[in-house]
Amino acid sequence: MFEARLIQGSILKKVLEALKDLINEACWDVSSGGVNLQSMDSSHVSLVQLTLRSEGFDTYRCDRNLAMGVNLTSMSKILKCAGNEDIITLRAEDNADTLALVFEAPNQEKVSDYEMKLMDLDVEQLGIPEQEYSCVIKMPSGEFARICRDLSHIGDAVVISCAKNGVKFSASGELGNGNIKLSQTSNVDKEEEAVTIEMNEPVHLTFALRYLNFFTKATPLSPTVTLSMSADVPLVVEYKIADMGHLKYYLAPKIEDEEAS
């Protein structure tokens, strides 16, 4: 059987909020090493990859590997019934067609349990190649969310230009254009407020803001976000989940011809 208990249950609530608008259903691959999910979004434009390592859970048991087909909208509805302070336990038998979710209030005076029907999903796993990137930007996740939100009022796409001294986000549309430039921070007290840029070569790429705004739903999971870019390969937007793993989004750049058309 599979059983995983998470004292900080709010992490699972935040993960579902970050996934549910982008993907409707996905396979949760559960093994002794932890929980993994990989899925294209419903329009097959972006890819999501989630890792929650077993040691990040407070107790974790998995006797044999399971692939659980989950409707993320349904799971999100059930998790909304959990309080932010609740302890969450996930449980499934080896051949189960349901996943049990148990929510315990911290004072243990209230226990709620739900059973969610699982789905049969035929999922192909895509190999994600390890890649060296020309430009890696680490910045506060709230700042990235705000930039994407602000620029989506101007245009549908953002051009991210990365050079040694800073990174520029630009958008243009019918009302005009907007540019937001962030310089690398030299001295900040808190690491999560820093902007750091590792650049091997300059990068100038265009991405659909609609998808970046979906990705920023993961902002509550992490104070920082990492953007990794190279020409002609998908952008990686990574949110670390403290002591547990990460949530990564992949988005291919828009081709220049598409913009002209």
Curated annotation (Swiss-Prot):
Stated name of the protein: Proliferating cell nuclear antigen
Described function: Auxiliary protein of DNA polymerase delta and epsilon, is involved in the control of eukaryotic DNA replication by increasing the polymerase's processibility during elongation of the leading strand. Induces a robust stimulatory effect on the 3'-5' exonuclease and 3'-phosphodiesterase, but not apurinic-apyrimidinic (AP) endonuclease, APEX2 activities. Has to be loaded onto DNA in order to be able to stimulate APEX2.
Pfam family, one: PCNA_N
PANTHER family assigned: PROLIFERATING CELL NUCLEAR ANTIGEN
Crosslinked residue numbers (Glycyl lysine isopeptide (Lys-Gly) (interchain with G-Cter in ubiquitin)): 164
Sequence positions bearing N6-acetyllysine: 14, 77, 80, 248
Position of the Glycyl lysine isopeptide (Lys-Gly) (interchain with G-Cter in SUMO2) cross-link: 164, 254
